[in-house]
Structures are given as C-alpha cells and as structure tokens.
C-alpha cells in the first residue's frame, strides 16, 4: 500500500518525507481523477 511504499522510499532517502513528496503525484489531482493535470 501507499504507506508501506513511503516507508520503503524513506529508508533509501533520509531527511525527506516521501509520503508528502508523492502526495500530489499522478495524472490528475482532485477527487475521482478530475482536475488539472499534475504531470505532462
């Protein structure tokens, strides 16, 4: 799940908060996949 993924990345990258870094990652932000594209 996403929490376990965050802990795994945190072990590799110290002094960062990976859960927050990837919070807005994805094709679209917002509920149900609607909203402005986040990545091109």
UniProtKB/Swiss-Prot annotation:
Annotated keywords: Disulfide bond, Secreted
Spans through the membrane: none
A GO CC annotation given for this chain: extracellular region
Gene3D superfamilies, per the entry: Phospholipase A2 domain
Keyword Ribonucleoprotein: no
One Pfam family of this chain: Phospholip_A2_1
Origin superkingdom: Eukaryota
InterPro entries: PLipase_A2, PLipase_A2_dom, PLipase_A2_dom_sf
Entry GO MF terms: calcium ion binding; phospholipase A2 activity
Subcellular localization: Secreted
Tissue: Expressed by the venom gland.
Gene Ontology BP annotations: arachidonate secretion; lipid catabolic process; phospholipid metabolic process
Record-stated family: Belongs to the phospholipase A2 family. Group I subfamily. D49 sub-subfamily.
Subunit structure: Heterotrimer of alpha, beta, and gamma chains; non-covalently linked.
Primary role: Heterotrimer: Snake venom phospholipase A2 (PLA2) heterotrimer that acts as a potent presynaptic neurotoxin by blocking synaptic transmission and synaptic vesicle recycling. Enzymatic activity is essential for the neurotoxic effects. May act by binding in a calcium-dependent fashion to neurotonal pentraxin-1 (NPTX1) and neurotonal pentraxin-2 (NPTX2), but not to neuronal pentraxin receptor (NPTXR). Also binds to taipoxin-associated calcium binding protein 49 (RCN2), a protein localized in the lumen of endoplasmic reticulum. Monomer (beta chain): Snake venom phospholipase A2 homolog that is neither toxic nor enzymatically active. Does not bind calcium.
Descriptive protein name: Neutral phospholipase A2 homolog cannitoxin beta chain 2
């Amino acid at each position: 799940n996403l929490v376990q993924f965050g802990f795994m990345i945190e072990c590799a990258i110290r002094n960062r908060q990976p859960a927050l870094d990837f919070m807005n990652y994805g094709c679209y932000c917002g509920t149900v996949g609607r909203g402005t594209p986040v990545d091109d």
